[in-house]
Amino acid sequence: MTDEWHDLPDFSLGERDIDVLAVLREEDLATFSFEGLKRRLGLHPETLSRILLRLEQEGFVEKKIDGYGVTSRINEFLRTNPKYNGDSRVTLLKTFLPSDIPVARLVSDLRGRWFGFLRWLGLSDDGGSVTLKWITEDGGIQVEAHISETALTIEAKFLQEKNMNTALKACYQLLNHISQLCSPLRRVQNASYCSGSNAYLTSA
């Protein structure tokens, strides 16, 4: 992994520091939580605290009220824009959202929240859509909600073994909360979920 990074003497970072930076870049995280990143990386809390302190001192991350933010300096440390494409992602659900619920409001209500065995990881924003990310308590599955205008897609990224049942349960825990947020106006409609090559359609 270290060969994907600039060998710049100005950065006094170790291998673990670089591994953390690689994950932050891989996930395109703009903000993240300590607890979520700890589970994502499987690191001891004290180890991660020391790493984040070094990254903060180097200007790669900054503390915020609701966790940490990733600064633009991370781009200075990259030779290219490496992303690991070998992960196992599965689309669990695609649905429409009420058009009269602003995306910003929905994101604000979801970010930082815990659902069942899902723990908040962080958020990425490409300007056209927002992706909110959670991780299971055991760090085995990452669940992502992609929100773009009136569309919602929920995906699972398997970091350990591929447990579809756990992923689907996590997906519906998240969808249930989103439905509650939308219920004053209109509930989420026409949800479909995918398992392998099969697709299923449900109605609200």
Predicted regions and their residues:
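Short acidic, hydrophobic short linear motifs in intrinsically disordered regions
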Residues: 28-40
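Short amphipathic alpha-helical interface segments
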Residues: 14-30
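Short Lys/Arg-enriched alpha/beta "domain-start" segment
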Residues: 81-131
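Short, cationic-aromatic polyanion-contact patches
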Residues: 4-17, 66-85
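Long, contiguous binding/interaction regions
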Residues: 79, 86-87, 169, 181
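Charged, low-complexity intrinsically disordered regulatory/assembly segments
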Residues: 117-204
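Short amphipathic alpha-helical interaction segments
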Residues: 42-57
